[in-house]
Amino acid sequence: MAADCTVHKLVADLALFSGDRVLLVKYKDVRRYDGQRGWFLPDDHLRHEEHPVDAAKRIATEQAGHAVPDVRLSHIESFGDGAWHLIFHYRAELKPGAHVTPAGNVKVAEWFPLTGLPEPSAVAHHGWALDVLKAMAGGSR
């Protein structure tokens, strides 16, 4: 990280699984997402003094309309890209066939089979959510 980095972003994302499917979303206002369009795992910045676990649970409620009592940390990622990012990657399970209602800044929420995910070019940040899901697959599901 460059010594002159003045922007720091703490972010949580949540891979919501329902059976063999994962939820991806597209946002209405992409300014908070580095102007990126395309599919994302539901995510948001951490609020002041918010624990990452609480952020992941909030994201499930605010963006997918589901309260999830149990989220599990998959891994943490850190990178600089003009701003330093620390990303907490969480996962949670919903019952098979769960219906989601896009809310807040979510324009579209769609379940994708794990064997039929979108092409990287259709996923924000050059397919980053696909890389996160691949890293999660290396662990227990």
Model features per residue range: what roles?
Residues 1-24, 76:
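Conserved N-terminal beta-strand and adjoining loop/helix that marks the start
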Residues 31-37:
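A conserved beta-turn-beta hairpin within the catalytic core of GNAT-like acetyltransferases
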Residues 44-69, 77-128:
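Unchanged
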Residues 40:
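Conserved glycine-rich beta-strand-loop-beta hairpin in the small C-terminal domain of fold type I
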Residues 127-141:
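Charged phosphate-binding loop/patch that engages nucleotide di/tri-phosphates or the phosphate backbone
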